[in-house]
């Protein structure tokens, strides 16, 4: 049996890492202009400065798959806790590094080089962070509460972005432009380091996930089991990898469309004031927190597959409607358009952390999820702002981002409807059930075939 209260503490300790990742993401986005002035001052063109700044930002996405491979292997071999402790240390250090870096005027070309190294370190550590957090929470939560607890990781995402927005807004109204450009921009990054240290303090108190410990005991009984490489992993689990890749894709395309692309879209295309845009996006994210909690509970009751399809179906039908409302340039209708996207994004925020780890067996779960997740994010999620802005600039059609989102949602709907099997309230593949009450324990004792529902599938895939 697992302790429900300990599971909640686990969500908080792991969610802080996710909050820190998106706190950094938000800071870099909001402070991009100031960062470009400090680290690329030798570039005469302001637009080119921003290009270099965002190119440095994009480097992190290229390193995520490598981090996923390295930390995934470590996490499956040596445990989930050691990886989560390591990644948050690296994230805290890289955040501190950005906050204390000398500018180009002080050390010349070494300034952008060191900024690039800090972003490389962030990307590498992030590659193991989020997948590890999902795995750890899923393995530590009662099966019947996996989605409602797992969505706490995405609450961390929203909270980190909201905190970055509020902090940058506070600096803008409390400091002069000269102060902000000179030293004020460093404050949020220094505060981010303390957030990371607090997360490290909480994570050091965590125990290893019970499911991983059970797997290690089983491994001692079967010491001759051969290690599974990446190609063997693909061979045995290609269907699960496809479903996971597509799920991560439609989740992150929607996520980056709302969080990364919409601010610049509303300013550049819809011609809204920058401050108004920031406040609007922040308010929508605040609304998304209770929505994610609600959909997490619903997913535990009716199954995550149905909640996936609600989100996908809604975006297929209403993405164009949402972007069309934004074209009216009325603050009310623009807000409704953004809220529509945020509402359906909440269905993914609620279900992804608790569902993605269930697609793989315990002995390969960390590396399979880390590699698949980060490759999908790097190829499709992180490129969403670039693709959306390219579509608008080349077609002169402000609705093309909606068409892109619709196409991705249609693909997701087909894959989830045909290939995904709901695992809500079921035990994780390769493990015994996680229960937090006597009633469930007695049920599985009387119905062992329900407890080990995955056994037949595993026997067909592997020989032990």
Swiss-Prot record:
One of its GO terms (molecular function) is symporter activity. Its main location: membrane. InterPro entries: H+-coupled_symporters, MFS_dom, MFS_sugar_transport-like, MFS_trans_sf, Sugar_transporter_CS. Keywords: Cell membrane, Membrane, Symport, Transmembrane, Transmembrane helix, Transport. It is a multi-pass membrane protein. Belongs to the major facilitator superfamily. Metabolite:H+ Symporter (MHS) family (TC 2.A.1.6) family. May be a proton symporter involved in the uptake of osmolytes such as proline and glycine betaine. This is Putative proline/betaine transporter. It comes from Staphylococcus epidermidis (strain ATCC 35984 / DSM 28319 / BCRC 17069 / CCUG 31568 / BM 3577 / RP62A). The gene is proP.
């Amino acid at each position: 049996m697992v302790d429900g209260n300990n599971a909640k503490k686990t969500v908080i300790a792991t969610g802080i890492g996710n909050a820190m990742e998106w706190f950094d993401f938000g800071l870099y986005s909001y402070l991009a202009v100031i960062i470009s002035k400090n680290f690329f001052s030798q570039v005469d063109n302001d637009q080119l400065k921003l290009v270099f700044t965002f190119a440095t930002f994009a480097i992190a996405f290229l390193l995520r798959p490598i981090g996923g491979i390295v930390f995934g292997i470590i996490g499956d071999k040596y445990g989930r806790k050691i990886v989560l402790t390591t990644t948050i240390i690296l994230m805290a250090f890289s955040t501190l590094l950005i906050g204390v870096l000398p500018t180009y005027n002080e050390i010349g070309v070494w300034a952008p080089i060191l900024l690039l190294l800090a972003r490389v370190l962030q990307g590498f550590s992030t590659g193991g962070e989020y997948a590890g957090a999902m795995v750890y929470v899923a393995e530590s939560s009662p099966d019947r509460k996996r989605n409602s607890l797992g969505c706490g990781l995405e609450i961390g995402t929203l909270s980190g972005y909201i905190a970055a927005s509020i902090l940058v807004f506070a600096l803008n109204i409390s400091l002069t432009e000269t102060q902000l450009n000179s030293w004020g921009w460093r404050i949020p990054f220094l505060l981010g380091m303390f957030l990371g240290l607090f997360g490290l303090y909480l994570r050091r108190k965590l125990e290893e996930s019970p499911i991983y410990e059970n797997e290690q005991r089983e491994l001692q009984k079967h010491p001759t089991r051969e290690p599974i490489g990446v190609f063997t992993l693909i061979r045995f689990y290609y269907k699960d990898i496809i479903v996971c890749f597509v799920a991560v894709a439609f989740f992150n395309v929607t996520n980056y469309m709302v969080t990364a692309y919409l601010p610049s879209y509303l300013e550049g295309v819809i011609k809204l004031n920058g401050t108004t845009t920031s406040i609007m996006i922040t308010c929508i994210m605040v609304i998304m927190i209770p929505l994610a909690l609600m959909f997490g509970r619903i997913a535990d009751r009716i199954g995550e597959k149905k909640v996936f399809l609600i989100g996908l179906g809604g975006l297929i039908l209403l993405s164009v409607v949402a972007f069309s409302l934004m074209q009216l340039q009325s603050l009310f209708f623009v807000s409704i358009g953004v809220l529509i996207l945020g509402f359906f994004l909440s269905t993914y925020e609620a279900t992804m952390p608790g569902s993605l780890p269930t697609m793989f067996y315990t002995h390969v779960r960390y590396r399979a999820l880390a590699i698949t997740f980060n490759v999908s994010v790097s190829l499709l999620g992180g490129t969403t702002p670039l693709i959306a802005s390219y579509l608008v600039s080349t077609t002169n059609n402000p609705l093309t981002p909606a068409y892109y989102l619709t196409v991705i949602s249609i693909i997701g709907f087909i894959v989830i409807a045909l290939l995904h099997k709901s695992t809500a309230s079921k035990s994780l593949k390769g493990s015994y059930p996680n229960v937090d009450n006597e009633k469930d324990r007695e049920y599985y004792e009387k119905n062992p075939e329900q407890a080990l529902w995955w056994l037949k599938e595993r026997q067909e895939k592997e020989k032990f």
